[in-house]
Regions:
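Charge-dense, helix-prone N-terminal extensions
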Residues: 2-156
């Protein structure tokens, strides 16, 4: 039997692999998708695809606005949230799903003009919350993204 796999073991292994590849991401508290930490566009797109309900379309639109504003943007998923940054400058923005809204964090938000509306406990961070029925001012959002991308980013 050396070097051989029993039929039962091979069958169990196949089932385990197929379950992993077809499993949908788990939604954490507030409906935030659980996506493994990774760099690049693919994990960010997996996060967006796993965003529940109305948040998915908003996530796609935010991602498109960020990419069109900063074509050289660097992407990653860290701590179950997409991060956007500039190579060798750090991260300037993060997105997180909560029960009733999407939270966009501008890590140097107090340096933006106008300052995004929601305060943070962290000195420089400001948030922009998007609720289901909100109309996003895309020009303002793109301007924040443009300004944020030119500031020193967070080293995370």
């Amino acid at each position: 039997m050396v070097g051989k796999t029993s039929k039962k073991s091979a069958s169990v292994a196949k089932k385990t692999v197929s379950k992993r590849s077809t499993a949908k991401p788990k939604l954490l508290t507030g409906g935030n998708p659980q996506i493994a930490k990774a760099d690049g566009d693919a994990p960010v797109q997996a996060y967006i695809a796993a965003m529940p309900g109305w948040k998915r379309d908003v996530g796609r639109r935010l991602d498109a606005l960020i990419v069109s504003t900063v074509p050289s943007v660097r992407k990653a998923v860290k701590w179950n949230s997409p991060f956007y940054g500039i190579e060798d400058q750090g991260w300037f923005l993060g997105i997180h799903c909560l029960t009733k809204y999407i939270k966009v964090a501008f890590f140097r938000g107090t340096s933006l003009s106008p300052v995004p509306p929601v305060e943070s406990k962290q000195k420089e961070v400001r948030y922009f919350h998007i609720h289901e029925d909100d109309v996003i001012d895309e020009a303002q959002f793109a301007e924040w993204v443009n300004q944020a991308s030119q500031l020193p980013g967070e080293r995370i």
